[in-house]
From Swiss-Prot:
Quaternary state and interactors: Monomer.
Swiss-Prot/TrEMBL cofactor(s): Mg(2+)
Keywords from the named record: ATP-binding, Kinase, Nucleotide-binding, Transferase
Molecular function, one GO term: phosphoglycerate kinase activity
Entry's family note: Belongs to the phosphoglycerate kinase family.
Record's miscellaneous remark: On the 2D-gel the determined pI of this protein is: 5.3, its MW is: 22.1 kDa.
Enzyme Commission number(s) from the entry: 2.7.2.3
Protein name: Putative phosphoglycerate kinase
Length: 27
């Protein structure tokens, strides 16, 4: 369970980073 949660958190973090990059590029 802990490992699964960590993976989800990592994926979520990467998703947020991608969103930030997209926002910067769109500006």
């Amino acid at each position: 369970f802990a490992v699964g949660t960590e993976s989800i958190a990592k994926t979520f973090s990467e998703a947020l980073d991608t969103t930030k990059i997209s926002d910067v590029l769109s500006k």
